[in-house]
């Protein structure tokens, strides 16, 4: 028996004919009933639970849940993939690291954490790691969250506990909290047989530029080839995915400020033993505040000139440097978004957090408050706080909802 479907304004199926139809066997066949509007969100949530039934994350410190240059269970639970899974109501295993963590997250104020000097631009966690606590009891590896602090795309594809041990015992310890021997993020992801994968693997290719070493960024073509190999592995699983892009403008980064803003704080800086040259007022340069300010504090009495030494780790960026960084991020974002569209995957960018308006710059707040870079950024000036991670989780949910027609709260 055939049903003929019309498209009434309410958008549900309508049958031509009577409210019930008698089949050739004499049975009464009831027509399909429209879905009540109040039931549709529940059905969409059920669909999202199917989509994300086995949700696996590839990524960097932003996905792992690093806060204040350390990773521990509280930050891991707050990471945007974990928040996304919780909103969708799906299981999501996290390789939770016991207190005090790997490295123990720094405690405020920023002024007391001169240990950060020289660590910026690389993996903050392993750079200052003093201890790496074991996992909480009962956790089986690999878990759903495979993201590792400091990972570049090439690390996700190639790096194992064993390969990292040849470079850094600290990094090997961190990898051992996430992966089994011989595994990479990508091989562990494939082994998990995911239904959905998040891929956030672009930030660490650009991060060295925050110190002023713009030439230390990973070349776009090198990153692209590795990134595409990772996406091919994701595609091979048949899973859905959300790809994560970079911020749009490095100058909007919460811990990057104009030299003139820095100059305007000269009375407070002078009280700390830092004289600020008038050159800062006239300069068009930008300063990566955590590194620049902590370095000055370690040398007091001293004078800040806001001058740039090309490709030196001086935490000074010229306007030209910002343009170069933004050009690379734009190229990477365009490629990530293109690959997402080609594969029918969702896409959002870290711009949802890092391009938000910044709070007013006050050196006293930066050095001595609990939130030196605003409520959304942790003490290190780089990684999201729990509130910042919630912003990313919302951006991810909106992107997935739009692409897959589901309703993740």
Task: Annotate each predicted stretch with a short phrase.
Residues 2-12:
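Bacterial N-terminal signal peptides that target proteins for export
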Residues 11-20:
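Bacterial N-terminal signal peptides
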Residues 19-50, 406-409:
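Bacterial Sec-dependent N-terminal signal peptides
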Residues 53-69:
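Catalytic nucleophile-elbow at a beta strand-turn-alpha helix junction centered on a G-D-S/GDSL motif
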Residues 68-229:
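Conserved SGNH/GDSL esterase-like catalytic core that processes O-acyl groups on lipids
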Residues 80-84, 370-409:
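Histidine-centered active-site loop/cap adjacent to the catalytic His
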Residues 236-240:
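A short helix->loop->beta-strand "cap" motif at the edges of active sites that frequently abuts
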Residues 255-327, 331-383:
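Mobile gating loops/cap/lid regions near enzyme active sites that modulate substrate access
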């Amino acid at each position: 028996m055939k049903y003929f479907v019309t498209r009434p304004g309410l958008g549900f199926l309508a049958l031509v004919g009577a409210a019930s139809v008698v089949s050739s066997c004499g049975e009464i066949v009831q027509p399909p009933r429209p879905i009540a509007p109040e039931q549709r969100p529940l059905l969409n949530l059920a669909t999202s639970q199917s989509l994300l039934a086995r949700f696996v994350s590839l990524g960097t410190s932003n996905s792992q849940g690093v806060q204040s240059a350390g990773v521990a269970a509280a930050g891991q639970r707050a990471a945007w993939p974990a928040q996304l899974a919780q909103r969708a109501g799906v299981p999501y295993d996290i390789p939770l690291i016991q207190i005090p963590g790997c490295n123990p997250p720094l405690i405020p104020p920023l002024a007391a954490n001169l240990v950060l000097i020289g660590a910026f631009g690389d993996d903050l966690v392993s750079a200052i790691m003093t201890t790496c606590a074991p996992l909480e009891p009962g956790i089986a590896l690999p878990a759903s969250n495979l993201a590792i602090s400091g990972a570049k795309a090439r690390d996700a594809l190639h790096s194992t506990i064993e390969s990292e041990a040849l470079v850094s015992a600290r990094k090997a310890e961190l990898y051992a909290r996430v992966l089994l021997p011989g595994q990479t993020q990508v091989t562990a992801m494939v082994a998990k047989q995911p239904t959905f994968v998040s891929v956030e693997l672009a930030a660490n290719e650009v991060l060295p530029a925050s110190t002023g070493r713009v030439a230390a960024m990973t070349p776009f073509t090198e990153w692209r080839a590795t990134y595409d190999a990772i996406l091919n592995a994701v595609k091979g699983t048949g899973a859905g995915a959300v790809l994560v892009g970079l911020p749009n403008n490095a100058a909007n980064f919460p811990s990057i400020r104009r030299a003139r803003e820095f100059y305007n704080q000269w009375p407070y800086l002078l009280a700390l033993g830092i004289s600020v040259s008038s050159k800062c007022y006239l300069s068009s340069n930008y300063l990566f505040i955590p590194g620049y300010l902590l370095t000055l504090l370690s040398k007091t009495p001293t004078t800040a000139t806001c001058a740039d030494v090309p490709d030196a780790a001086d935490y000074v960026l010229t306007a030209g440097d910002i343009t170069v960084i933004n050009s690379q991020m734009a190229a990477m974002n365009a490629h990530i978004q293109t690959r997402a569209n080609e594969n029918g995957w969702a896409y959002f960018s870290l711009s949802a957090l890092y391009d938000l308006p910044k709070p007013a710059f006050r050196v006293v707040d930066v050095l001595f408050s609990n939130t030196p870079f605003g409520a959304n950024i942790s003490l290190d000036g780089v990684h999201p706080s729990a509130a910042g991670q919630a912003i990313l989780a919302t951006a991810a949910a909106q992107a997935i909802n739009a692409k897959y027609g589901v309703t993740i709260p």
